[in-house]
């Protein structure tokens, strides 16, 4: 929803409205992400049981999910920044940020999982820290451009602005949510069959996610 709302404002030459959209997006999603992260960290044990994690993988799964849940604000911050870039007509910069994050992620995975032998926790640390890198890169670029100036008042919640963002964004979120729920159900069924089946399904889901990149970018 943010990308569309910013695009409309920029297209109309209304930088003040674009600033309000950006400020309200930051307020809405960053506060929401912190609350969500705290809730999920508190529920990590029930979640691990809910998805029927094989006994031998419980400890690793718990560590992995805990670190990933703590990193939710980083994921949210990057997505907010990426939507701002795209709303201003720049789809290349987010691609560069993600490319850099992927390189960092691979390097950190080798370090944490290979050198330090941290296992699943190391993989989660690599992912979370690489996401933080993408956020820092995006922030540096967007602060240098100064194409849209923000004031403190832009971060004050405005009902009309948030309604516009959510009215466009919620249907898209619901669409993605349905897909993720179906994958979650498949994961639960695979976990119930044992560690080998769970690993196989995990690999296939990664491949499917890669194949979906092209149609999802249309």
Residue ranges and their predicted role:
Residues 6-11, 18, 47, 70, ...:
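Hydrophobic/aromatic residues within transmembrane alpha-helices of membrane transport systems
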Residues 27-31, 35, 70, 96-103, ...:
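Hydrophobic residues within alpha-helical transmembrane segments
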Residues 2, 43-44, 81, 108-109, ...:
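Hydrophobic/aromatic residues in alpha-helical transmembrane segments
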Residues 6-73, 115-170:
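Short alpha-helical transmembrane segments in multi-pass integral membrane proteins
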Residues 105-110, 134-139, 210-213:
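Hydrophobic transmembrane alpha-helices of multi-pass small-molecule transporters
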Residues 1-4, 68-75, 163-218:
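Transmembrane helix-bundle signature of multi-pass secondary active exporters and lipid flippases
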Residues 67-86, 94-102, 123-136, 216:
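Short runs within selected transmembrane alpha-helices of multi-pass transporters and secretion channels
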Residues 1-38, 75-94, 201-218:
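Small-residue-rich hydrophobic transmembrane alpha-helices
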């Amino acid at each position: 929803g943010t990308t569309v709302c910013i695009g409309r404002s920029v297209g109309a030459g209304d930088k003040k409205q674009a600033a309000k959209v950006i400020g309200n997006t930051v307020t809405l999603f960053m506060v929401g992400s912190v609350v969500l992260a705290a809730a999920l960290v508190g529920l990590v044990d029930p979640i691990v049981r809910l998805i029927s994690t094989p006994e031998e993988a419980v400890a690793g799964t718990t560590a992995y999910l805990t670190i990933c849940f703590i990193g939710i604000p980083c994921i949210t911050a990057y997505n907010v920044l990426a939507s701002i870039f795209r709303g201003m007509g720049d789809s290349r910069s987010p691609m560069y940020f993600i490319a850099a994050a992927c390189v960092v992620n691979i390097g950190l995975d080798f370090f944490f999982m290979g050198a330090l032998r941290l296992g699943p926790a190391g993989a989660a640390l690599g992912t979370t820290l690489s996401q933080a890198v993408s956020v820092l890169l995006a922030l540096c670029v967007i602060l240098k451009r100064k194409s849209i100036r923000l004031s403190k008042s832009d971060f004050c919640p405005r009902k009309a602005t948030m309604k516009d963002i959510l009215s466009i964004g919620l249907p898209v979120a619901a669409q993605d949510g349905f897909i993720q729920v179906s994958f979650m159900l498949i994961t639960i069924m695979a976990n119930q069959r044992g560690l080998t089946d769970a690993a196989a399904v995990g690999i296939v889901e990664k491949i499917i996610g890669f194949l979906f990149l092209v149609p999802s970018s249309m």
